[in-house]
């Protein structure tokens, strides 16, 4: 008995292309996971250096939760048990990123000289767009 590759000469090329596409998708997923992780670390470091004041305590608490939750929910989406579960987790990740962007913009407005704040606001916007794109494509 022969395997499919011997029966169809072009089969190995097709398998090779599929493996390459899958590998590229996996690398993109890892890039996003890494970016979400680094975003959370960057936010936590920035918050550690932020002025201690009564009015910033709530912002610091909320931002630390939303910035870390976005990555955590995306990680959970990678082990989803169904398409609906995947969409739900990515949707939560997007909502948390949008919340992070909101808190970061408040910090930027109140404390414009905060180290890395411009970068973090921009990164939250980019990550939000990526997550929204994944969500839209997953729903189709």
What are the roles of these predicted feature ranges?
Residues 1-76, 80-140:
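Short, C-terminally biased terminal segments at protein or domain edges
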């Amino acid at each position: 008995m022969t395997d499919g590759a011997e029966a169809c000469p072009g089969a190995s090329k097709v398998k090779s292309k599929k493996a390459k596409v899958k590998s590229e998708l996996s690398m993109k997923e890892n890039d996003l996971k890494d970016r979400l992780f680094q975003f959370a670390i960057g936010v936590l470091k920035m918050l550690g250096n932020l002025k201690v004041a009564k009015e910033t305590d709530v912002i610091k608490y909320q931002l630390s939760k939303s910035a870390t939750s976005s990555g955590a929910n995306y990680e959970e989406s990678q082990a989803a048990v169904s398409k609906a579960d995947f969409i739900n987790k990515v949707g939560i990740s997007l909502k948390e990123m949008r919340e992070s962007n909101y808190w970061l913009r408040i910090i930027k407005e109140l404390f414009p000289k905060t180290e890395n704040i411009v970068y973090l606001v921009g990164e939250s916007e980019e990550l939000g767009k990526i997550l929204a794109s994944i969500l839209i494509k997953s729903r189709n």
